[in-house]
Amino acid sequence: CGELGLPVSIHVADPQAFWKPYDATNERWRELKNHPHWWFGDPAKYPPFAELLAALDRVITRHPETTFVCVHFANNAEDLDWVEQALDRHPNMLADLAARIPELGRHDPARVRRLFVKHQDRILFATDFQVYERLTLGSGGDGPPPTDEDALAFFDKEWRWLETNDRQFEHMTPIQGDWRIDGIGLPADVLRKIYFDNARRLLVRSWPLPVLRAIRVDKDFKPDGRLKESVWAQATPARLEYRLRDGIARPALATTARA
């Protein structure tokens, strides 16, 4: 991937609570009860949390020419010092926010803001928003599937946390823990990088500029009635060709999509 200039999205470990006792004392008990296979506290089956993070650090160190996007805020949103020190050590490391704003929002907002401003070029907006047979907004249980209105409320809380200094409001995935979060009120120039510029910088190295538009890959999802399906159906399939840094295309890695 370093040779191709392709970033690697890497998921190592999970919330620290998934290694804590599997009982009602666990702050994520509601989530773990719904997803018992997410519990990794049995040392006979799973490595310790710290061992997984150490392995991640070794991989990033071993491949300095590869850009690693460490999802879920490097899966250590509970420990801002660890993430900050890792970003300091590794210029080829980025962290995304997927499903970790509830954890990040528990910290002192001034501390989080300082970290985000310091590493404003290395943090990516992300949600863990998934569309399979039902919406998944970061996490979920066995209740009714989320609605489009739930999705709007989910994003509103994401924006609120990043853009305002509001205090002690409910976070977007209460199944992940019963606490409130504090907004970090980032400056507009930092928000633009986190929302857009940092991702564009990663993707432009990999995709030809003419097709950097919204795309729908045919097998990705079924329209929910709000999309103009007739427009998508008439769109001409386009090839997204991955290229080496010297501009040489790699046709074997191309993806066909409607653009």
Question: Which ranges hold each PLM region?
Answer:
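Short acidic, gly/pro-rich beta-turn/loop elements at beta-sheet edges
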Residues: 20, 105, 135, 224, ...
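A mature extracytoplasmic/lumenal domain signature
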Residues: 12-14, 99, 129, 227
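Structural preference for beta-rich elements and adjacent junctions enriched in aromatics
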Residues: 208-259
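Divalent metal-binding pocket/active-site signature
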Residues: 1-82
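H/E-rich (His + Asp/Glu) clusters that bind or coordinate divalent metals
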Residues: 50-58, 67-208
